[in-house]
Amino acid sequence: MAQLTCQNLCAGYDGRPVLQDLSFELLAGDYLCIVGENGSGKSTLMKTILGLQTPISGRILTGDGLRKNEIGYLPQQTVVQKDFPASVREIVLSGCQGRCGSRPFYNKEEKQLAAEAMDKMQITRLARRCYRELSGGQQQRVLLARALCATQKMLLLDEPVSGLDPKVTAEMYTLIEKLNREDGITVIMISHDVAAAVRYASHILHIGDTVFFGTRADYLQSPQGRLFDVKKGGDIQ
């Protein structure tokens, strides 16, 4: 049974579609990279999956035990967010807010979940540090740990390596791949890095004048894949 199904989706702003007639489905444990030119609708799709935006038409359905409030989200950071004056532990714990309901405090289980998420992201030693004092790569690990507190089923990542140097980028990709491969978490990631998409993803959704959805192997043989020369490591600008 599909964990996420997109049926004939039309999405956009003020009634003006950015995406039209988009359909695909993902199973639990899939790793989807969404690629395409700027303005093609990648972030619009992600916001619609999260329920932050209402479709113009069509539907997004969850299944296989996934509820819409069980999707973890790592958005692109703003300048203000990067300067947020809270401890690493406080930020990671805030990912448990959806589990608290009307309860105004975190319980033992939620604190343990945050501790485990920090351990997976290898940031336990930073727990008492102020978030705004961290490097960009460390901040992204904190936000990924926060997203993990919201779900053990599906993560949505909006360009999680944007602005990071090559070494830190490779480390982030490795952490994300490990969550997918070892923990079975479904990953949906927006990326401009086609080479990385082909290296790590099980499926690729290429949004542009024409749309491709399929496996990594099929993408390599598609017109979109050949256009960006992914076999040599292409980049969509």
Residue ranges and their predicted role:
Residues 130-134, 138:
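Conserved ABC ATPase signature
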Residues 203-216:
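H-loop (His-switch) and adjacent beta-strand-loop-beta switch element
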Residues 108-126:
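Conserved ABC ATPase "signature" region
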Residues 166-168:
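Helix N-cap at the start of a conserved alpha-helix in ABC-type nucleotide-binding domains
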Residues 191-192:
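H-loop/switch region of ABC-family ATPase nucleotide-binding domains
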Residues 155-158:
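Catalytic Walker B motif of ABC-type/P-loop ATPase nucleotide-binding domains
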Residues 35-37:
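The feature captures the beta-strand-to-loop junction immediately N-terminal to the Walker
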